Amino acid sequence: PCRNVVTKPVQKPQPPMWMACTNRATIKVAASIGVGALAFSFVDPEEARAWAEIYYDIIKSDACVPIGHAVNANMAMVSNFSVHQDQAEAIRRGQEGFEFFSYAVNALVAHDALPGRSTLFEDFQKSRARSDEEIIAATKAAARNANGIGTPDDIRQHIEGFRDAGVDQVIFLQQAGRNRHEHICASLELFAAEVMGEFKAEVAEREAKKAAELAPWIEAAMARKPWMQPLPDDQIPV
């Protein structure tokens, strides 16, 4: 219905709607109401592929009944992020902060964390399974490190995995724990210089192909949408 929107976005059309998703069940809900799925769980590309298939299978079915005035058919995945030419240094700069973010989110949801009283970071450090140096050693021993924390080549493979799995966008988590501002800026600069360009070059063609493929499904979904009747002036919420 009509309502007073605060703050008032300048963008026209209005910014697309997204829903935070943490598991397959919430992915299904997002697709069924035609909103973007912001996957706030740190999953690997194989699990991401399963989520993308679930999401787009529903978008392309009668089960999609849009809640808004448009369908935002997109899936975004949150990812860890720390880039350095030295893989070990990337881990030292970003791994602990990323792990702490995951720990803190779980603690705030699953436990009664009290501001100014709970000792989340100290508790996290006591419970941490492996040190940075142990993770560095394991990473060096691995045949492949497609990861958001590593060298430009590592993160390139990481993004390629999500792209090939059907993920539309990747959101990099950076400001967490004791991650330093200058390290975050250095990671972003290196990413922009050595990785981002090749993916940006693909965007227009990939988005056009996707839009053409989804157009009949989105048109059918909008035709199923039950539209509300206009409210009398005295019933418009303010």
Which residues fall in each region the model found?
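Glycine-rich, proline-tolerant flexible connector loops at the mouths of alpha/beta enzymes
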Residues: 42-45, 172-188
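An alpha-helical appendage that flanks or caps ligand/catalytic pockets
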Residues: 1-6, 46-167, 196, 200-238
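Short catalytic/ligand-binding loop motif for oxyanion handling, primarily in non-cytosolic enzymes
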Residues: 26-27, 48, 85-86, 179-181
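A local structural motif
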Residues: 9-16, 142
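A conserved active-site cap/scaffold subdomain adjacent to cofactor or substrate pockets
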Residues: 22-53
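Hydrophobic faces of well-ordered beta-strands that scaffold small-molecule active sites
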Residues: 17-20, 35-40, 73-80, 170-172
